[in-house]
């Protein structure tokens, strides 16, 4: 009835997790404005996919509740950041189509490993669900007695919550890498570097999201991979990831010089 529906909507919109998301997104707006739209979209994707599973793919319920949650998050985050925004002047002006694009080989060097791991993991999960071999702790029970499900519904309902969360973050991270190849925001840079700030802000958050995903995926496949092939795959991915850490020596040296030479420390005069 209407009373139960109203209570349910209020409970979903005023969920403590939604309130915390609203606060932190408002905080992001004050600390780094770019994080405000980035994590509003990422949070929206996580909430939408979660609602799809929780409400058993009932279209109207999913979009109604997700829409109300999105409105609440936007409104509450604006209120949280309002004292700061009243005295803040944005540098960004307009959204433009990208005229220059990153060469494919450079994209592969920078992002090939995390994107390959993410999409390989998605393929593994889909294969398991189709073959009904998703046999690990946290997996929802099979719905053998129910009507035949669509492939998309079967995939979403067959994923453990942690897997769905990680896949959502991974897809969002891939989107953040690709977005500066399509559009950029006019701000403090011009000429050949007009995409620089847009690319830095988006790919920096993509790097963080990829880091969360890779840590989960490699351990997930090593512990619950199910086959030696997947365990070997995860170990190979771990070795490749460890090899990238070697670049830290070059990066630190290029910026700080010889860190073992105290006379080069600038301290407060840096």
PLM features per residue range, with description:
Residues 64-270:
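Transmembrane helical bundles and short interhelical boundary loops of multi-pass, membrane-embedded
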Residues 35-46:
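Transmembrane-embedded, aromatic-rich helix segments that form part
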Residues 14-21, 65, 69:
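Residue-level signature of transmembrane alpha-helical entry/exit and packing/kink sites
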Residues 27-37, 185-190:
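Membrane-interface helix caps and helix-loop-helix hairpins in membrane proteins
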Residues 19-31, 79:
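Membrane-interface alpha helices of multi-pass inner-membrane proteins
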Residues 1-13, 45-57:
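Membrane-interface transmembrane helices that cradle and orient dolichyl/undecaprenyl
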Residues 25, 34, 56, 60-65:
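Carbohydrate-active enzymes and regulators
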Residues 12, 16, 53-61, 155-156, ...:
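Short, glycine- and charge-enriched coil/turn segments that flank and shape catalytic ligand pockets
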């Amino acid at each position: 009835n209407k009373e139960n529906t109203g209570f349910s909507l209020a409970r979903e919109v005023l969920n403590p997790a939604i309130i915390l998301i609203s606060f932190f997104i408002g905080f992001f707006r004050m600390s780094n404005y770019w994080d405000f739209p980035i994590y509003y979209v990422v949070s929206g994707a996580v909430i939408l996919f979660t609602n799809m599973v929780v409400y058993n793919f009932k279209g109207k319920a999913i979009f109604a509740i997700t829409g109300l949650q999105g409105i609440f998050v936007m409104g509450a985050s604006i209120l949280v950041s309002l004292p700061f925004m009243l005295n803040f002047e944005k540098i960004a002006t307009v959204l433009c189509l990208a005229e220059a694009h990153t060469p494919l080989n450079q994209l592969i060097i920078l992002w090939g490993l995390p994107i390959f791991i993410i999409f390989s993991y998605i393929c593994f999960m889909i294969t398991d669900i189709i073959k009904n071999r998703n046999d690990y702790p946290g997996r929802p029970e099979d719905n053998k007695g129910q009507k035949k499900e669509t492939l998309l519904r079967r995939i979403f309902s067959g994923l453990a919550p942690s897997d769905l969360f990680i896949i959502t973050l991974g897809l969002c991270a891939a989107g953040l890498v690709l977005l500066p190849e399509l559009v950029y925001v006019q701000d403090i840079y011009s000429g050949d570097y007009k995409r620089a700030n847009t690319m830095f802000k988006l790919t920096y958050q993509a790097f963080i999201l990829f880091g969360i995903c890779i840590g989960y995926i490699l351990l997930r496949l090593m512990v619950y991979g199910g086959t030696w092939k997947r365990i070997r795959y995860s170990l190979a991915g771990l070795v490749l990831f460890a090899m990238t850490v070697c670049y830290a020596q070059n990066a630190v040296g290029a910026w700080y010089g010889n860190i073992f030479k105290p006379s080069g420390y600038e301290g407060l005069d840096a």
